[in-house]
Amino acid sequence: MKPYFKKGVLLNFASGYNLTFHNVELPPDSDVVMAAPRMLGQGVREMFVSGEGYPAFVAVAQDASGKALEYAKALCKAIGATKKGVIEGNINDETYLDLMTELGVLPLVYKVFAEAFKLETEMGHPEEAVLMEAYFSKEMMFLWEQAAERGLFRQLCLHSHTAQYAQLKRFGEGDNSMIRNFLKEAYESIRSGEFDKEWQAEQTKYNLEHLDALREKALNTEVTKAEDRLKARLK
């Protein structure tokens, strides 16, 4: 891209990652902004086409023109983000929060589903029923949609009294130190630059060798094999 940089151009990043960790050399006489959709790429396209839109973070990394923020907001409007709301922040906010989801929150979610599948099938429950209850029915997707609309706990009004009591009682029980430590380790790996160093090496030195191995391992777990069997039966 560097040969195409000219004075006065606007350079936009859809993520703050490479800006936070200084992995790119910015053109000195140009506006550099971030319009970062809070949505997966496929969802960005589908929600743009449908007219629904999606939220986004917006920030300015470099303001050569004095109008960089206005340009960034206009870009957010053009891609459909203003229909759901644009939050102005700084580059590091987007990077840290995005990576915390990827390094901290989602791995815990995957662990919970995988362990629940293992335990429930060991207790003799049919694997197809376990998967359907967990997420194949898309009830969980509806739950999270309602959490986004109503609030994490306010969506509980849609559940039966039994479900409300069970969830709230267990939410207040147990020792959260393991979860806290897991999340804190993730945050420290971001703040120290340890994760970026590891990821840069994975891309340049190892040519994604470890990523390929991790994907292969995940796709050969018992839960993935059970998913394949259930999908074949549902066709």
Predicted features along the sequence, with ranges:
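Short, conserved loop/helix-junction motifs that constitute active-site signature segments
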Residues: M1-K7, E25-D29
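Active-site-proximal catalytic alpha-helix in oxidoreductases
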Residues: E52, G66-G80, K84-G124, E128-A148
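NAD(P)-dependent Rossmann-like dehydrogenase/reductase catalytic/cofactor-binding core
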Residues: H125-K235
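Flexible, active-site-adjacent loop/turn segments at secondary-structure boundaries
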Residues: P3, L19, G89, E94-D98, ...
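A broad, structural surface signal
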Residues: P3, A114, K118, N181-E188
